[in-house]
Amino acid sequence: MKNLTLSIRHETLYRYEKPVGYTLQLLRLTPRTEIGQRIQQWEIKTQGKRQSSIDAFGNSSDMLTLAFPHQEISIIASGLVEVQSPDRGRMPDIVPISPLVFTVPTRLTEPTETIREFSSRHLSAHATSSQLISLAEAICSEVSYQSGATATESTADVALALGKGVCQDHSHLFIACCHTLGIPARYVSGYIDPGDVEHSASHAWIDVWIEEADYAGWISIDVTHACLQSARYCRLAVGRDYESAAPIRGIRRGGGTESMSVNVKVRDIGR
């Protein structure tokens, strides 16, 4: 598959019932610098002050501070990113961090007994790429895609019990299954070019560590679509789960009831 240049625009608007005195938000809205992904141009527009840094997982992040009264926050991230389709989903890692870091369960990916039983039917140690795709298919069969069925704080176990969820839940359940066997797996947040079909352009998938005859390293799998990552995907951040890779997380003082609207548009400029 040829390289794609993705045009991305991600708009987030927060509105508050009453004035907010102070807001602190962590933004992971700049695409990662990786082999096979290159930023051609990118900007983030918002009020307040931002301090940029690179976190322990190699993600670009901005700490946004609004230390004045406000009743809305507008955050717009946009630009062009050139993406190359990885060979068989393989993702050479430029961040010198042990994959064992991604074998530690979190609150969202804790492998409960129910998950262990499910995993035992669909996953084995030293699983191959095709076997991991089969696990993704089993997860999609067990947890049907339904927007609004879960919340950002929902655990993998909750999604499995409900039998429905979204890409975040599919990813968390896949990671939890890997944890049952000590297989490193990590959460990826980013964007997908939906093409000509209806699909949320903001997306989540996973990287999983494999050891095959000719390769030991990460491969990237879109659990929701049970396929390997291609050039249609732009990677924002990786982490142990949603909480450590979310595009926006924050706290505030005051404001009362909050409403949030999000609009994400992704397209291949060559299409």
Language model features: what each stretch is:
Residues 3-7, 34-42, 146-148, 164-170, ...:
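A broad, low-specificity signal for short, low-complexity segments enriched in glycine/proline
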Residues 1-117, 182:
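Linear, non-domain "peripheral" regions
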Residues 169-258:
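Hydrophobic/aromatic-rich core segments of domains that either
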Residues 12, 150, 224:
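Ser/Thr-centric signal marking residues that sit
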Residues 8, 27-29, 44-46, 77, ...:
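Generic structural hydrophobic/aromatic packing signal, biased to beta-strands
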Residues 83, 93, 97-165, 173, ...:
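Secondary-structure boundary elements
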Residues 16-18, 124, 212:
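A generic structural motif
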Residues 19-21, 26-28, 63-65, 101, ...:
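Residue-level preference for alpha-helix termini and adjacent loops
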